[in-house]
C-alpha cells in the first residue's frame, strides 16, 4: 500500500472528514516520525511496533558496474520491529 492509497482508504472510511484533512494528518504524522528518528529518539506504538535507529558499521563494498572495492562509512539506518499483536495478525497468511 502506498501513502496515497492509505490516504484514499482512510478518507473513504472516514467520510465525515474531508480528504484534504486526512492527507494533511497522514503527512504530518509521517513527518513527525521522521524528525523524531532524525533526532535519535525511538518511537513506540503499542500493539503495532517500534521504530529506532540501528548503527551499520563501516565495511568494504563493491561498485556493481566495475567490481572495484569501495569503502563505505558507518551510518545509522531506520529499523522497524513489529509488536506482538501485529506479528500475530500478519501470521494468518503464514
Swiss-Prot record:
Disruption phenotype: Decreases expression of genes encoding virulence proteins. Drastically decreases survival in host macrophages. Decreases virulence in mouse. SMART domains: BHL (SM00411). GO terms for cellular component: chromosome; cytosol. InterPro entries: Hist_DNA-bd, Histone-like_DNA-bd_CS, IHF-like_DNA-bd_dom_sf, IHF_beta. It comes from the Bacteria. Keywords: DNA recombination, DNA-binding, Transcription, Transcription regulation, Translation regulation. One of its GO terms (biological process) is DNA recombination. GO terms for molecular function: DNA binding; structural constituent of chromatin. Belongs to the bacterial histone-like protein family. This protein is one of the two subunits of integration host factor, a specific DNA-binding protein that functions in genetic recombination as well as in transcriptional and translational control. NCBIfam families: hip, PRK00199.1. HAMAP family: IHF_beta (MF_00381). Heterodimer of an alpha and a beta chain. This is Integration host factor subunit beta. It comes from Salmonella typhimurium (strain LT2 / SGSC1412 / ATCC 700720).
Amino acid at each position: 500500500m502506498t501513502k496515497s492509497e492509505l490516504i484514499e482508504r482512510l478518507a473513504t472510511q472516514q467520510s465525515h472528514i474531508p480528504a484534504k484533512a486526512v492527507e494533511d494528518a497522514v503527512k504530518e504524522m509521517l513527518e513527525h516520525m521522521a524528525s523524531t528518528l532524525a533526532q535519535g529518539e525511538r518511537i513506540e506504538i503499542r500493539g503495532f511496533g517500534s521504530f529506532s535507529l540501528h548503527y551499520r558499521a563501516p565495511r568494504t563494498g563493491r561498485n556493481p558496474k566495475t567490481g572495484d572495492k569501495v569503502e563505505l562509512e558507518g551510518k545509522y539506518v531506520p529499523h522497524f520491529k513489529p509488536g506482538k499483536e501485529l506479528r500475530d495478525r500478519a501470521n494468518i497468511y503464514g
